[in-house]
Amino acid sequence: MTGDRELQALLRLTAWLSPAFPIGGFAYSGGLERATADGLVIDAASLAAWIATLISHGSVWNDAVLLAESHRQQPSPAFLAEITALAEALAGSRERHQETMLLGDAFVAAARAWPDEVFERLPGKTAYPVAVGAVAGAHGIGLEKVLVAFLHAYASQAVSSGIRLGVAGQRDGVAVLAGLEEHIVEVARRAAASTLDELGSATVQADIASLRHETQTTRLFRS
């Protein structure tokens, strides 16, 4: 039965972080669209570098730390409310704030298909990494597995955005994902051992791109 529970947990994690899960993640680029327009991302190599940097030093790293702490502290409604407020404060632009909160709400709504008391502990509006961490933790899914899947889902979405923006083809996109595997594992392990003291980013160009996207006239994405 233990093996069955582990496989069931894997199925849930795969479903929750699948591109088919109805949260609307395809509508957001996290500033990548602006970075492409500004010539910061021009090909598969620069796309890979952009993704890797955000995962290890940018907003995605912060999301991973928030996810990890939410996974550990999911029994506490007060903590989940506090860490959601922290996630909102860390959003560097209006669109970034909108992205994390709308994705979080959509994730919670869809994940209710797997009933659990954790949904009663979540605040009325929940940031995306907080929602993923708390729900996965309540379902007993290992933290490192959740982080690897979460980071890979981000990378996959960013690659898909890059393909739609014309900076990489499909084969190049697959190669970018393959090349990021070791990096994702390393960052996931680091995030699993992190505390909130390790929050912080050093991706100024990405933050500026997210801000500049708000005034971009022609665009495919909401961020």
From Swiss-Prot:
InterPro entries linked to this entry: UreF, UreF_sf
Subcellular location(s) of the protein: Cytoplasm
Protein's UniProt keywords contain Amino-acid biosynthesis: no
Any one GO MF annotation of this record: nickel cation binding
Record has Transmembrane helix as a keyword: no
Pfam family name, one: UreF
One CC-aspect GO term: cytoplasm
Domain of life of the native organism: Bacteria
UniProt KW keywords: Chaperone, Cytoplasm, Nickel insertion
Coiled-coil annotated residue ranges, if any: none
Family, per entry: Belongs to the UreF family.
Cited function: Required for maturation of urease via the functional incorporation of the urease nickel metallocenter.
HAMAP family the record matches: UreF
Subunit structure: UreD, UreF and UreG form a complex that acts as a GTP-hydrolysis-dependent molecular chaperone, activating the urease apoprotein by helping to assemble the nickel containing metallocenter of UreC. The UreE protein probably delivers the nickel.
Protein name in UniProt: Urease accessory protein UreF
Taxonomic source organism: Rhizobium etli (strain CIAT 652)
Organism lineage string: Bacteria, Pseudomonadati, Pseudomonadota, Alphaproteobacteria, Hyphomicrobiales
